[in-house]
């Protein structure tokens, strides 16, 4: 019992001997509350300057539909080479047979597409104009509602200006060859009369051309 009291006393003395530490004033405390910081305004982002483009404004929704349909068909045809340059197109056609052709983007500001073809004198490029909702080649008066009807016309013309297209893939899928053969046999105007299921009929109608 005495030993316990002695330990307690010693603890009491040592505790009392330690000086009390006053809490240091917080840097954030003050006599008056600090005003909330105002959010900095975001820097103004300058509007992007309109880039140069040869795509002009469509005059009607019908023109827009024709161009978007032509673009979709070009993506599916296999002989659309996109932004290939004139020099690049001519180099690819140089060793090909006469009549071989491809379609690419035109570099002219007033045209969407250009036709590059291997002629007897060498490769050449012709602008494809789109005016009043119709497509025609530069220097020709014959115009067509669809770009691929224009191509079919010059493939089947007596002078046979166009021959086989230069495809990016040399080996075509069998289903594309079958579709081309069916369209050539029955004609695209009769595709709806073929007794097929809707899936096959839609596939035939997605590219109803003989090219």
UniProtKB/Swiss-Prot annotation:
Changing residue 22 to W: In AISIMD; loss of inhibition of cytokine-induced STAT phosphorylation, including IFNG-induced STAT1 phosphorylation, IL2-induced STAT5 phosphorylation and IL4-induced STAT6 phosphorylation. GO terms for cellular component: cytoplasm; cytoplasmic vesicle; cytosol; intracellular membrane-bounded organelle; nucleoplasm. Keywords: Cytoplasmic vesicle, Disease variant, Growth regulation, Nucleus, SH2 domain, Signal transduction inhibitor, Ubl conjugation pathway. One of its GO terms (biological process) is regulation of cytokine production. Interacts with multiple activated signaling proteins of the tyrosine kinase signaling pathway including JAK family kinases, TEC, KIT, GRB2 and VAV. Binding to JAKs is mediated through the KIR and SH2 domains to a phosphorylated tyrosine residue within the JAK JH1 domain. Binds the SH3 domain of GRB2 via diproline determinants in the N-terminus, and the N-terminal regulatory domain of VAV. Interacts with the Elongin BC complex (ELOB and ELOC). Component of an ECS CBC(SOCS1) E3 ubiquitin-protein ligase complex which contains Elongin BC, CUL5, RBX1 and SOCS1. Pathway: Protein modification; protein ubiquitination. Residues 67-78 are annotated as: Extended SH2 subdomain (ESS). It is linked to Autoinflammatory syndrome, familial, with or without immunodeficiency: An autosomal dominant, autoinflammatory disorder with incomplete penetrance characterized by autoimmune cytopenia, hemolytic anemia, thrombocytopenia, and lymphadenopathy. Additional variable features may include autoimmune thyroiditis, psoriasis or eczema, nephritis, hepatitis, and symptoms of systemic lupus erythematosus. Immunodeficiency is present in some patients. Disease onset is usually in the first decades of life, although later onset has been reported. It is found in: Nucleus; Cytoplasmic vesicle. Belongs to the SOCS1 family. Residues 36-49 have a biased composition (Pro residues). Pfam families: SH2 (PF00017), SOCS_box (PF07525). The ESS and SH2 domains are required for JAK phosphotyrosine binding. Further interaction with the KIR domain is necessary for signal and kinase inhibition. Residues 79-174 form the SH2 domain. Expressed in all tissues with high expression in spleen, small intestine and peripheral blood leukocytes. PROSITE patterns: SH2 (PS50001), SOCS (PS50225). Transmembrane segments: none annotated. It comes from the Eukaryota. One of its GO terms (molecular function) is protein kinase binding. Residues 161-210 form the SOCS box domain. SUPFAM superfamilies: SH2 domain, SOCS box-like. Essential negative regulator of type I and type II interferon (IFN) signaling, as well as that of other cytokines, including IL2, IL4, IL6 and leukemia inhibitory factor (LIF). Downregulates cytokine signaling by inhibiting the JAK/STAT signaling pathway. Acts by binding to JAK proteins and to IFNGR1 and inhibiting their kinase activity. In vitro, suppresses Tec protein-tyrosine activity. Regulates IFN-gamma (IFNG)-mediated sensory neuron survival. It comes from Homo sapiens (Human). Residues 55-66 are annotated as: Kinase inhibitory region (KIR). Residues 1-53 are annotated as: Disordered. Residues 173-182 are annotated as: Interaction with Elongin BC complex. This is Suppressor of cytokine signaling 1.
């Amino acid at each position: 019992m005495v030993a316990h009291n002695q330990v307690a006393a010693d603890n009491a003395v040592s505790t009392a001997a330690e000086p009390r530490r006053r809490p240091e004033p917080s840097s954030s405390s003050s006599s008056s509350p600090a005003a909330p910081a105002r959010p900095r305004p975001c820097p103004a982002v300058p509007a992007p300057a309109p880039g140069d483009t040869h795509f002009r404004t469509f005059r009607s929704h019908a023109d827009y539909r024709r161009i978007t349909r032509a673009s979709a068909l070009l993506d599916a045809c296999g002989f659309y080479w996109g932004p290939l340059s004139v020099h690049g197109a001519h180099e690819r056609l140089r060793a090909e047979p006469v009549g071989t052709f491809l379609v690419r983007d035109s570099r002219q500001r007033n045209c969407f597409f250009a036709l590059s073809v291997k002629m007897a004198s060498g490769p050449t490029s012709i602008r494809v104009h789109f005016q009043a909702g119709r497509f025609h080649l530069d220097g020709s008066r014959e115009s067509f509602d669809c770009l691929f009807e224009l191509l079919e016309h010059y493939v089947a013309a007596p002078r046979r200006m166009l021959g086989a297209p230069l495809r990016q893939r040399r080996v075509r899928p069998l289903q594309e060859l079958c579709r081309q053969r069916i369209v050539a046999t029955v004609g695209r105007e009769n595709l709806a009369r073929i007794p097929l299921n809707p899936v096959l009929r839609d596939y035939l109608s997605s590219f109803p051309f003989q090219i």
